[in-house]
Structure formats: C-alpha cells, structure tokens
A protein has these predicted regions:
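Acidic, low-complexity/disordered tracts enriched in E/D and polar residues
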Residues: 1-54
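Long, charge-rich, low-complexity alpha-helical segments
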Residues: 42-104
C-alpha cells in the first residue's frame, strides 16, 4: 500500500498565520491566490506549496495512504473523497518524481 513519506533532507515549515488567513478567506467564499502556506528548503532553494499542496505535504508522514490523505482533504473542504483522489494522486506522483517524497 502506497504510504508517501517526506524526504527527511527537506527542511520545511508551515506558515500558520498565512494558512489561517487562506482558510478564513475560503470559508467566506473569497477567491484565494496560490500564496505559499508551506515553505520547503532543499539544496539552497526555497519552494512554496499552496494551501492544498501544503495540507497534502503535511500528511505525507509514511503512516497514511493516498486514500487516507484524500479522505482528510475531502473532510477539510466538505467534498466527496472521489472528487479529490485524482488530484492527490497526481500531486504525490509529481513530488515523488522530484525526489521530495518516497513510498513508505
């Protein structure tokens, strides 16, 4: 079973204030930009993940399957799990190809 695990060489942090602002804006029905809510540092480069990418990243602990992660995301955004499964799989696949995740 595929349980994505973050690359331990990547230093990362959650921009909690920014994440809270974006979640509040979404709840109010406002459009949100793709501002980073999670910052990754790798090989001297800084990368930002938007809200959804950041929420997925935070759950890639080697304990949860892709389906578990999709389920959590579906709950967070009050949608059916099937609506997010493909996006979660594609995002995890992309980060795995970059070497940022592995299959735990």
């Amino acid at each position: 079973m595929n349980k994505p695990q973050r690359n331990p060489e990547i230093v990362w942090r959650v921009e909690k204030r920014r994440q809270a602002e974006v979640l509040k804006a979404l709840e109010a029905g406002e459009d949100v930009d793709d501002s980073g809510t999670v910052i990754l540092l790798l090989s001297g480069m800084m990368h930002q993940l938007n809200l959804v990418g950041g929420l997925i990243w935070q759950q890639c602990d080697g304990q949860k399957t892709q389906a578990d992660i999709a389920g959590e995301l579906a709950k967070e955004f009050s949608v059916e799990q099937v609506e997010v499964e493909t996006d979660v799989a594609e995002f995890i696949s992309d980060l795995t190809e970059r070497g940022w995740l592995s299959n735990g």
